[in-house]
């Protein structure tokens, strides 16, 4: 079953209950054709073990807790990228919340790696109050974590190739609304906005330049 498969549409989904200790999985995007995969926010209970078959590329971000991927422990803000053909066994001892993006990529992707959240390299963003940690750079797409201190305002900008945001902490804002932790926002190709934060600040996962443009 397809869900939010039309990339020309702006989508906002609240999955705040999962980040607040809920269980289960919130599907953010899926398509009828199996090769397109799906995007979800999943809460894994303590002591669970599961497998990734490796038939598609898997991107994984640890939102809460810890997960072991093929025996390697990854804590909060850690990012793993498993190329197609790379199966994995995953387990969590105390439970975790994960962002999972499983798909066949639009561009060649053969690299598999993991970045630990505690050792990410943060750099100054384009305006004061922003810190950016790059997670993956593709031919057209870019994936990063962005930390916003309270009362930060960013420049108005246009999303060439679209933008996808998952709010990890705090409250993210723009002229269209306010988005607490656990909110997923997908903005289409050539959409625009002027984001900012209030007194809470925010940390977000952001992916740009990767959506369908037709």
Task: Describe each PLM feature range.
Residues 1-36, 95-140:
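A short, N-terminal "cap"/entry segment at the start of jelly-roll beta-barrel domains
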Residues 23-72:
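The feature marks the first
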Residues 41, 49-54, 71-72, 91, ...:
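Short histidine-centered beta-strand/loop micro-motifs
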Residues 54-69, 152, 159-175, 181:
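Glycine- and acidic-residue-biased ligand/ion/polar-headgroup-sensing regions
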Residues 69-88, 173-193:
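Short acidic-glycine-tyrosine-enriched beta hairpin
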Residues 73, 84-108, 189-214:
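Ligand-binding loop in jelly-roll beta-barrel domains
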Residues 116-169, 174:
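Surface-exposed interaction/gating patches
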């Amino acid at each position: 079953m397809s869900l939010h498969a039309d990339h020309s549409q702006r989508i906002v989904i609240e999955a705040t209950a999962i980040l607040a200790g809920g269980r289960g999985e919130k599907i953010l995007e899926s398509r009828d054709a199996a090769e397109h995969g799906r995007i979800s926010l999943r809460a894994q209970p303590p002591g669970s073990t599961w497998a990734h078959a490796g038939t598609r590329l898997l991107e994984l971000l640890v939102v809460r807790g810890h997960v072991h991927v093929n025996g390697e422990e990854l804590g909060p803000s850690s990012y793993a990228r498993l190329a197609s053909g790379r199966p994995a066994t995953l387990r969590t001892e105390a439970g975790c919340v994960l962002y999972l993006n499983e798909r066949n990529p639009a561009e060649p992707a053969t690299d598999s790696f993991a970045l630990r959240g505690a050792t990410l390299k943060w750099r100054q963003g384009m305006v004061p109050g922003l810190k950016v940690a790059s997670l993956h750079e593709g031919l057209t797409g870019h994936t990063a974590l962005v930390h916003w201190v309270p009362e930060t305002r960013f420049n108005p900008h246009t999303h060439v190739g679209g933008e996808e945001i998952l709010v990890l902490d705090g409250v993210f804002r723009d002229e269209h609304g306010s988005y607490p932790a656990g909110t997923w926002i997908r903005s289409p190709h050539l959409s625009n906005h002027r984001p900012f934060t209030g007194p809470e600040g925010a940390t977000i996962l952001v992916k740009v330049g990767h959506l369908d443009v037709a």
